[in-house]
């Protein structure tokens, strides 16, 4: 289901999904307009290329989205980002969450099923 007039970012390469075999991959969900505006998944992969971990790269995108919207007082939406490096390191972050409700990423690795707890920028009540 999609609200009429809303933009879907998921099928747009570089926005909802981006993969580079030399670096890793990232995916995003939430307010599509913000993910499109920042080329969100591409941005995360490029942050990893420059040396950031997947977690740091996801957090960097959340901060970028908040900054280009004029700060936390203007954030009335949420975006969530996941990333994996070519070596299998993962990360996830969201712009806002309730206290104690950290974003999580479920994934399969050579060690079996795992759940990774990420971070968020803004705590909501």
Predicted feature residues:
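N-terminal nucleophile
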Residues: 1-125
